[in-house]
Regions:
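Soluble non-cytosolic domains of exported or imported proteins
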Residues: 50-58, 105-109
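Bacterial N-terminal signal peptides
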Residues: 8-19
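Structural motif
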Residues: 22-23, 67
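Boundary/entry segment of secreted carbohydrate-active catalytic domains
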Residues: 23-48
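Bacterial N-terminal signal peptides that target proteins for export
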Residues: 1-8
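Catalytic domains of carbohydrate-active enzymes, especially glycoside hydrolases
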Residues: 58-84
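Short, well-ordered coil/turn segments that N-cap beta-strands
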Residues: 25-29, 71-73, 119-125
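Aromatic-lined substrate-binding rim segments of carbohydrate-active enzymes
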Residues: 77-128
Length: 128
């Protein structure tokens, strides 16, 4: 009986040790930043001039800070909405939501802004 008890305790201890080892090292907490129809960003009513684009950048920074405050560690940033791009592409034109004109080049690179700002806060960026 004593031997069975010892084996049972050993098996229980081994199971506990293995389950602790199997736990993920961190949680994956993220949210989507949707650009199609300017649902989350950029503001479709912002002006297309340099001042309007500066407001777009400031608003994106506020969204990233909001992610940081909510203790999220990942952002899924939509970079393709309507066969256009939120980054410099040799295949697709710039999104009309950035400048008001499809293919109009903005004064900044939105994808690079998101990557730099999020990484500075320890937030991963995944594009879709």
């Amino acid at each position: 009986m004593k031997f069975v008890k010892q084996i049972s305790l050993l098996a229980l201890g081994l199971c506990m040790a293995l389950s602790l080892h199997a736990q993920p090292k961190r949680e994956f907490r993220g949210s989507w930043l949707t650009t199609v129809w300017a649902i989350d960003w950029p503001n479709p009513h912002s002006q297309a001039d340099a001042a309007g684009q500066l407001k777009q950048q400031q608003y994106m920074l506020s969204l990233i800070k909001l992610h940081e405050k909510a203790n999220l560690n990942a952002i899924f940033f939509q970079v393709r909405g309507f066969a256009d791009a939120m980054y410099k592409s040799k295949y697709e034109p710039w999104s009309q939501y950035l400048t008001g004109t499809r293919g109009g080049e903005p004064t900044y690179d939105p994808l690079q802004l998101v990557i730099d700002s999020a990484h500075a806060r320890g937030i991963e960026v995944h594009v879709w």
